[in-house]
């Protein structure tokens, strides 16, 4: 049996989709459980079949899936897994989405557009999820899209602890890639010894439609070691441009830090050649450092394992990032 039994007979079971099984295995090791065996395959027309190899009746079930490319396939697989657990009489189902898909589509920018992030929450609830766990949501209001508990975890302590251990904080400036991330940058600055802050001012290109251009730095970065942060990096164009602007403003060095390394092409090429000393991310999505010498990947599994443990034991998830009940 892969379950973790307690005296009250509540049963913790961990399940993993096929997108990032290494992450689930790391979480399982920290929890001292095994990932529940599952049969999953694709039919010729692209439909997905899943079946669990053990009874889930009465279990406290945690379903981990990373939403990397092909994102829609892995989202559908997680929904099918949740539905199978619901129909198998699981007691409670927690959907763990380290990277919340469609998070950038959290509101209507123009008429006749969907609010895709809300739809994802509705799909998870309809499938049978009782609770959602995610890490560094693109916007906080996504928590309100799901009609149930949402545990919004933060990778900042993981990233800042690494920076504290490796870099001299006396010369650091925390830089937000735009004005919208300044509040997050403030938290980073407080954690990194009340470091000074700056942000990159962006305007829309007058030459290319729908393109945003980083054009100047607000704040003093001359001679400083800059920590340029964001919640996610996709193609890397904005961040690479920000590195260039910081260098032009006299920054001595630039370190990029993000929770979610989506790294769609041509991100690797851009970020490895933009002049950044290091790119730091976590493994909320599958990562490979092969051919990318300045990429550092930090494990998110310990945070997820502690979160699962607190939920299972009816503890306080808040203590994991605030330090008190």
Swiss-Prot record:
Its EC number is 2.7.6.1. One of its GO terms (cellular component) is cytoplasm. GO terms for molecular function: ATP binding; kinase activity; magnesium ion binding; ribose phosphate diphosphokinase activity. It is found in: Cytoplasm. Gene3D superfamilies: 3.40.50.2020. D-ribose 5-phosphate binds at residues 204, 230, 234-238. It catalyses: D-ribose 5-phosphate + ATP = 5-phospho-alpha-D-ribose 1-diphosphate + AMP + H(+). Binds 2 Mg(2+) ions per subunit. GO terms for biological process: 5-phosphoribose 1-diphosphate biosynthetic process; purine nucleotide biosynthetic process; ribonucleoside monophosphate biosynthetic process. Its cofactor is Mg(2+). It comes from the Bacteria. The active site is at residue 202. Mg(2+) 1 binds at residue 138. It is an enzyme of class 2 (transferase). Keywords: ATP-binding, Cytoplasm, Kinase, Magnesium, Metal-binding, Nucleotide biosynthesis, Nucleotide-binding, Transferase. Homohexamer. HAMAP family: RibP_PPkinase_B (MF_00583_B). This is Ribose-phosphate pyrophosphokinase. It comes from Corynebacterium efficiens (strain DSM 44549 / YS-314 / AJ 12310 / JCM 11189 / NBRC 100395). The gene is prs.
């Amino acid at each position: 049996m892969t379950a973790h039994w307690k005296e009250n007979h509540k049963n913790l079971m961990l399940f993993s989709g096929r997108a990032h099984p290494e992450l689930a295995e790391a979480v399982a090791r920290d929890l001292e459980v095994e990932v529940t065996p599952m049969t999953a395959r694709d039919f010729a027309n692209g439909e997905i079949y899943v079946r669990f190899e053990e009874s889930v009746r009465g279990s406290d079930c945690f379903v981990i899936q990373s939403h990397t490319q092909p994102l829609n396939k892995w989202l559908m697989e997680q929904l099918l897994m949740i539905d199978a657990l619901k129909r198998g009489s699981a007691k409670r189902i927690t959907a763990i989405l380290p990277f919340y898909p469609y998070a950038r589509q959290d509101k209507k920018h123009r008429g006749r557009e969907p609010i895709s992030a809300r739809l994802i929450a509705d799909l998870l609830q309809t499938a049978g999820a009782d609770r959602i766990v995610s890490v560094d949501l693109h916007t906080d209001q996504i928590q309100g899209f799901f009609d149930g508990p949402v545990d919004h975890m933060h990778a900042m302590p993981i990233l800042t602890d690494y920076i504290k251990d490796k870099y001299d904080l006396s010369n650091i400036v925390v830089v937000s890639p735009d004005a919208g991330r300044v509040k997050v940058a403030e938290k980073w600055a407080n954690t990194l010894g009340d470091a000074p802050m700056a942000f990159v001012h962006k305007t829309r290109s007058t030459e290319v439609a729908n393109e945003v251009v980083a054009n100047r730095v607000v704040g003093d970065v001359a001679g400083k070691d800059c920590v340029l942060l964001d919640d996610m990096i996709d193609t890397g164009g904005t961040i690479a441009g920000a590195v260039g602007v910081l260098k032009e403003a006299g920054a001595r060095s630039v370190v990029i830090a993000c929770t979610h390394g989506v790294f769609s092409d041509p991100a690797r090429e851009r970020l490895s050649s933009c002049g950044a000393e290091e790119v730091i991310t976590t493994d909320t999505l599958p990562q490979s450092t092969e051919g990318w010498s300045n990429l550092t990947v930090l494990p998110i599994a310990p945070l997820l394992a502690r979160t699962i443990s607190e939920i299972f034991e009816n503890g306080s998830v808040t203590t994991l990032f605030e330090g008190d009940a």
